[in-house]
Design a protein with these regions (language model features):
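Catalytic center-proximal scaffold of phosphoryl-transfer enzymes
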Residues: 1-196
Length: 196
């Protein structure tokens, strides 16, 4: 909340909202959840259309195609919430979306914001999966080093590098790299070369 007070804008994850209804539908075959999934499917259908477009065009098309669907979904959720029992799984799923509606639909007015954060969650999944294994890194300093290395490895992957080749090359070059040029070894600037 402090960050939001300092001018940051919250962007919600539509996949998290959708997942509440997906789980409800798969576990209880809820008709309401099934109908909600249809709305989410339409929103993601628009995203498939705009994924390769620049941010301005993406925002324009979202406004024309996805905004009416989102408005219809919001009105439908509000109506459904009036008839479902408090405390039910359906009520919880609806409340989750309605409580976060502004954040969930922020992507409609900003073409640079994705509909969900699945991409970033997939990037940090290796860290989350290894978390229990790394509980015993030996010390706080060792844990910080492991975090720095994991960050470098993921950044190298995101920049299209083979992590092992990147690390071997950087660690070989690092002792002779001038401090003023160490930034050249960061994954987004790195060019493979054999040290002199």
């Amino acid at each position: 909340k402090a960050l939001l007070a300092n001018g940051l804008t919250e962007a919600g994850c539509m996949a998290h909202a959708r997942r509440k209804f997906f789980d409800l539908h798969s576990q209880k075959q809820s008709l309401i959840a099934g109908e909600a999934l249809d709305y989410f499917g339409k929103l993601y259908g628009v995203e498939r259309e705009v994924v390769e477009l620049d941010a301005d065009e993406r925002r324009r098309i979202r406004g024309a195609k996805a905004r009416p669907i989102a408005d219809e979904l919001h009105a439908w959720l509000t109506r459904q919430r009036q008839v479902v029992p408090n405390g039910s799984g359906t009520a919880r799923a609806i409340d989750y979306s309605l409580k976060r509606w502004g954040a969930l639909t922020h992507y409609l007015s900003d073409g640079q914001v994705p509909i969900d954060n699945n991409w970033i969650e997939n990037q940090i999944r290796p860290i989350a999966l290894g978390r229990k294994n790394w509980l015993f890194a030996g010390s706080l300093r060792a844990g910080k080093r492991a975090a720095a290395i994991m960050s470098l490895v993921q950044s190298a992957k995101l920049n299209g590098h083979q992590p092992l080749a990147y690390l071997k090359n950087v660690l070989t070059r690092l002792p002779t790299q001038p401090a003023s040029r160490v930034g050249e070894l960061l994954p987004h600037r790195w060019q493979p070369q054999i040290p002199a």
